């Protein structure tokens, strides 16, 4: 039976690489915090983009999708769900908003976690209770054969396991046995190994990640979608989960791969936020000049959508004019056709 000993688990993960990643996150956080007050309009725009991207990506990871126009309308609450997928998307939107707006009042305790799950499935009425039957985590190989990858905590032990998990985590934070950035991924991995719900465990784990980061003062997920970063590198996400969950029941789990992955996602998010703040921060640089600067900083091709994402305050029309001008100068060339069209620096 697994024991939730965060003092011991935290000590085991403090390898040189993890310490280096922790220091990098702290450094980025400090640099970004100093400049947050200087770009309120940008941050508001980034918040809206992050909401859409987070809702889309976290659901897409689980195979829950809709069209881009429908997704945007759902996130902006300009329409109502038409089917089960859209019900689950709308539920995620609501819980994500609650997490960002009221995180200081939502403790990581079983009653609150159950309420979050209830709201996640508010449009279908299927949430808000621990699993009643055992579940398994399986995978399909190249030949189409399904294999059991991990057997979570059985249903009859789930309530006790969640109580023990939350108590151990709360005590670890109160006693400061380790930095929150170490304790949070330990908690999330344990949550996923318990797999306490019949459905929605992956999405709940990402909502809980955002909640715990916000409560600890690391609110980069407000402006840069952590879910989007995870979705863009799902192989690393699932690989780290598999590596760290091995031997979990026998207290032999190696949390390091998942902690490394978690900190890497945060560094990517802070790096992206700093780049966007830098792009706006240079008042003397024109918008076309900022588009050109993106190509100077990029080693690979950029699509119009990439530029729009990195410079949300620049209109699509301005981006298209800048691209046309840069092609005329011979600074960039166009590659691909149709939706695959991208642009790359000529000397790249």
Per-segment meaning from a language model:
Residues 1-348:
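FIC/Doc superfamily catalytic core
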């Amino acid at each position: 039976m697994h024991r939730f000993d965060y003092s011991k688990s935290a000590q085991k993960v403090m390898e040189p690489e993890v310490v280096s990643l922790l220091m990098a996150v702290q450094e980025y956080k400090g640099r970004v915090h100093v400049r947050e007050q200087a770009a309120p309009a940008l941050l508001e725009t980034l918040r809206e983009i992050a909401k859409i991207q987070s809702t889309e990506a976290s659901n897409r990871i689980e195979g829950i999708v809709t069209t881009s126009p429908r997704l945007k309308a759902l996130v902006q609450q300009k329409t109502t769900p038409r089917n089960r997928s859209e019900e689950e998307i709308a539920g995620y939107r609501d819980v994500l908003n609650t997490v960002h707006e009221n995180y200081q009042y939502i403790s990581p305790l079983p009653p609150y976690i159950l309420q979050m799950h209830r709201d996640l499935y508010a449009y279908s009425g299927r949430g808000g209770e621990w699993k009643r039957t055992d579940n398994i985590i399986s995978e399909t190989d190249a030949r189409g054969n399904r294999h059991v990858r991990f057997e979570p905590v059985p249903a009859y032990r789930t309530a006790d396991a969640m109580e023990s998990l939350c108590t151990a985590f709360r005590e670890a934070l109160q006693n400061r046995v380790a930095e929150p950035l170490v304790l949070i991924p330990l908690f999330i991995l344990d949550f996923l190994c318990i797999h306490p719900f019949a459905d929605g465990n992956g999405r709940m784990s990402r909502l809980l990640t955002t909640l715990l980061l916000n409560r600890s003062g690391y609110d980069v997920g407000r402006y840069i979608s952590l879910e989007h970063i995870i979705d863009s590198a799902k192989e690393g996400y699932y690989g780290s989960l598999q590596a760290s969950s091995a031997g979990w029941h026998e207290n032999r789990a190696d949390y390091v791969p998942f902690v490394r992955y978690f900190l890497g996602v945060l560094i990517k998010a802070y790096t992206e936020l700093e780049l966007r703040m830098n792009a706006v921060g240079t008042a003397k640089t024109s918008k076309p000049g900022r588009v050109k600067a993106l190509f100077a900083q990029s080693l690979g091709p950029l699509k119009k959508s990439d530029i729009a994402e990195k410079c949300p305050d620049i209109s699509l029309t301005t981006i298209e004019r800048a691209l046309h001008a840069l092609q005329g100068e011979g600074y960039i060339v166009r590659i691909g056709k149709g939706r695959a069209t991208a642009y790359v620096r000529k000397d790249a």
